[in-house]
Design a protein with these regions (language model features):
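Conserved active-site and cofactor/substrate-binding residues in soluble primary-metabolism enzymes
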Residues: 20, 58, 82-85, 89, ...
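Active-site helix-to-loop segments that bind/position phosphate- or nucleotide-bearing substrates
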Residues: 1-71, 75, 185-188, 211, ...
Length: 223
């Protein structure tokens, strides 16, 4: 909660309201992370990387819409910021999962629009049919709290925290920018809302694994 207050420039008297909204929204989060291993090609030149898709699910969107439709615009904005922090926790757990399972270290989170163009997204989303995340003609994902990014990896241990997104982001004018320092290729894996990594039914013949939502957000209370 304190991190959200600082990062998104809320007044201190909003602490209680933000904490309450965190409590209300967390049970509605159906966080899922998917990734597909790729090698360098003519369009993306990383030697080895994962195409990653992270989503909070549809219920979180509906909660934000409910507040907005009832003209509770401050609360809707707070929920949007809370959702961004939930997404950040999901990125962190996905990177840790890949490191633990494959002994590969992520070198950066590469969001489309920086090194590679946004119009690549439609083609990359073809890897994730059947996940419930859709893309429209404007390259917007639904549910809205869904993000696709590239995770280049190395066999050498990385000391830097690749999930410090501001470190690698080219938008130096962002109002929320934080100060720096303050198995088979093409198989799809899933991290979703069950308590541990398990085998799961194949999706179009592609094997997957799962990771729990409570594992993603454990020990986050009060931060």
């Amino acid at each position: 909660t304190n991190k959200i207050i600082r990062k998104y420039h809320f007044a201190g008297e909003n602490t209680g309201k933000i904490a309450s909204l965190c409590d209300v929204s967390l049970p509605l989060v159906s966080a899922a992370c998917y990734y597909v291993w790729k090698k360098a090609d003519t369009e993306i030149t990383y030697d080895e990387y994962a195409v990653c898709l992270v989503t909070l699910g549809t219920a979180f969107d509906k909660l934000v819409d409910l507040y907005a439709e009832n003209n509770c615009l401050l609360e809707a904005y707070m929920l949007d910021c809370i959702g961004l922090e939930f997404m950040s926790r999901s990125y962190e757990q996905l990177v840790k999962h890949i490191q633990t399972k494959y002994c590969k270290w992520g070198t950066k989170l590469d969001f489309l629009g920086d090194a590679y163009p946004v119009d690549m997204m439609a083609r990359l989303m073809e890897n994730f049919t059947g996940t419930g995340v859709l893309i429209n003609d404007e390259m917007m994902l639904k549910p809205l709290k869904s993000v696709l990014f590239l995770l280049p990896v190395s066999d050498q241990e990385e000391k830097a925290d690749v999930c410090r997104i501001c470190t690698n982001c080219g938008n130096v004018n962002c109002m929320f920018r934080e100060e720096i320092g303050s198995e088979q290729q093409n198989s799809i894996q899933k991290i979703s809302s069950i308590p541990k990594i398990n085998s799961m039914s194949k999706n179009n013949g592609i094997p997957g694994g799962s990771y729990g939502i409570r594992q993603i957000f454990k020990n986050e209370g009060g931060k």
